[in-house]
Design a protein with these regions (language model features):
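Conserved mixed alpha/beta catalytic, RNA-binding, or beta-rich assembly cores of soluble enzyme
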Residues: 2-44, 53-397
């Protein structure tokens, strides 16, 4: 009888991770114990993945509001700073904003509209249309914004982020001015010192600002890209990918993930004789069709993965084959024909009709989405995900 089960994704329960824990041992032991308890065999090319949160927690990669403030003060001189394009999030940005405000005399906060970079809306597109506002060209001050749109609350969180961010800045002792624009160069009419807080568009933003005459410009990826007073840091991403830990601190995106995943791969190989792929994952990069939010507030889906996860899928579209190449076949004859086609497929199907409709995403992004959806972001207690059969196809027995 042919095999009936394809890809399986399991969320594995793990201990609560604390700073200094040996995560390589914990992950390895969790996989081995789960295999025994649940009765599944370990195979070559299985995938084990860990949330970035437990990696950062084990590393103790944390920083305080005061650490952020000191770095901002050192880079901008403690004067006026234009803070542009932050995402609207209590978890992702509010604590960072407190640190930034404590390190400056005045904050000119420039928010993109109608939404932030990942789809959190201040207002709707319909409201822009109704008021005749052009988001590509119009720069609004706070008074004009309120006259046009009033006090809108986020539909999921119930927070008016304009009011919330304004209050945070004032609480930290800084003056605040708020404007709304989508061209980063608009901030230069208010200050030449700019901290751009966008994530995926940050390189373009920096280029535009540089060409327009910015005097001091750093990205959020350059704040806490080194340790301040013994704090955590991330040399590549700085504050990008950080989360609220407490009211006074953030957990930073993990660093040194490559040696970590390779150490787990080796330990599992020593224990099982199987070559298992290993990765660290953060946000899954999928988009909510209702809320329109893109689940990628992290700078990258996977900050570390083993070599076997490099690249993109190379797959045929079975529906296309069944409806076109083998439209006259059915039953076992159709099954045999499709299996034969899979076995003889080219090593690179890019641009070929038979691959049309397959997902052109990197393996780590696809698997990261699967892992994020499997582990969830709440109280499941499964920060380790074990995937089997991901690299199988219809011919695999």
């Amino acid at each position: 009888m042919s095999r009936m089960v394809g890809t399986v994704s399991r969320g594995l329960r793990a201990p609560i991770i604390r700073q200094g824990d040996n995560l390589v041992d914990i992950v390895t032991n969790t996989v081995l114990e789960a295999s025994k308890e649940d009765g599944f065999a370990i195979h070559d090319r299985d995938v084990v993945a860990m949330t970035e949160a437990i990696v950062a927690r084990a590393q103790g990669n944390y920083a305080t509001v005061d650490d952020i403030a000191e770095d901002v003060r050192a880079k901008f001189g403690g004067e006026t700073v234009g803070v542009i394009f932050p995402i609207l999030s209590r978890n992702r940005f509010a604590i960072c904003l407190r640190g930034i405000a404590k390190g400056a005399k005045k904050i000119v906060l420039m928010l993109s509209y109608p939404s932030d970079e990942v789809g959190n809306h201040l207002i709707s597109l319909d409201m822009l249309d109704e008021k005749g506002v052009n988001p590509y060209t119009d720069v609004l001050d706070l008074k004009t914004y309120r006259e046009l749109f009033g006090y809108e609350k986020h539909p999921f969180t119930g927070v008016d982020y304009v009011e919330y961010y304004e209050g945070l800045i004032k609480e930290c002792g800084a003056e605040v001015e708020i404007i709304f624009a989508n061209d980063p160069r608009a901030i230069l009419n208010y200050t030449k010192n700019v901290l751009n807080c966008d994530i995926h568009s940050r390189f373009r933003t920096k280029r535009l600002l540089k060409n327009a005459g910015v005097e001091i410009n750093y990205g959020l990826d350059e704040i806490l890209n080194h340790s301040v007073n013994g704090s955590g840091f991330n040399a590549e991403y700085g504050l990008l990918g950080s989360n609220k830990a407490t009211e006074e601190s953030v957990k930073l995106f993990p660093r040194d993930c490559q040696p970590f995943v390779e150490a787990i791969q080796k330990k599992l190989y020593d224990a099982t004789g199987k070559q298992i792929e290993v990765m660290v994952y953060g946000d899954g990069a999928f988009k909510d069709p209702v809320g329109k939010i893109w689940e990628l507030a992290d700078p990258i889906v996977s900050p570390g993965y083993t070599a076997g996860l490099e690249g993109t899928p190379n797959e045929l579209k079975l529906k296309y084959l069944a409806d076109n190449d083998f439209a006259s076949l059915s039953g076992d004859e159709l099954k045999a024909a499709i299996k034969g086609k899979i076995q003889e497929k080219d090593g690179n199907l890019v641009g070929q009709m038979i691959s049309e409709g397959t997902t052109p995403r990197r393996l780590t992004d696809l698997i990261g989405s699967l892992c994020d959806l499997t582990s969830g972001s709440g109280d499941k207690g499964t920060p380790i995900v074990y995937i089997q059969g991901y690299f199988d196809n219809y011919t695999t027995e």
